[in-house]
Amino acid sequence: MTIQEVYEKIGGNYDHAVQIMRMDKMISKYLLKLTDSDICDKLREAAGSMDPAALFESAHAMKGVCANLGLDDLAAAVSEVTEEFRPGSGRKLSDDEVKIRLDEIFAKFETTKAGIEEYKASL
């Protein structure tokens, strides 16, 4: 499986990733690191407590990583939670609505992770 094929499989934006990382080797390196990172675990922990500061911090970190890797759908989903808990911004969603959004993020992350794991196994 090529890096382009994994992006197609996971619904990522390969062209965007190339603009940022410049080389397939770099894209591959950081895409593979995503599967070993605790970035989604931190968001899960924050979701468990519904702590606004922890939710903002963990969602903001995940959004940045996903955006830089061209994982646009995942970055957009996480961005909504980031903005919901941005300090100084008023809440627009109920806790139940936030939990629904978080469940969608976790499902997208698991799908993305599975595609990356398949890519990793093909190396």
Model-based region annotation:
Residues 1-12, 25-35, 39, 65-80, ...:
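Amphipathic, coiled-coil-like alpha-helical segments
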Residues 16-17, 42-43, 81:
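Generic hydrophobic alpha-helical segments
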Residues 18, 28-31, 44:
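Amphipathic alpha-helical repeat scaffolds
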Residues 20-21, 47-48, 85-88:
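Hydrophobic residues in alpha-helical segments
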Residues 41-54:
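Helix-loop segments that flank and shape redox-cofactor active sites
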Residues 62:
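An anion-binding catalytic pocket shared by soluble metabolic enzymes
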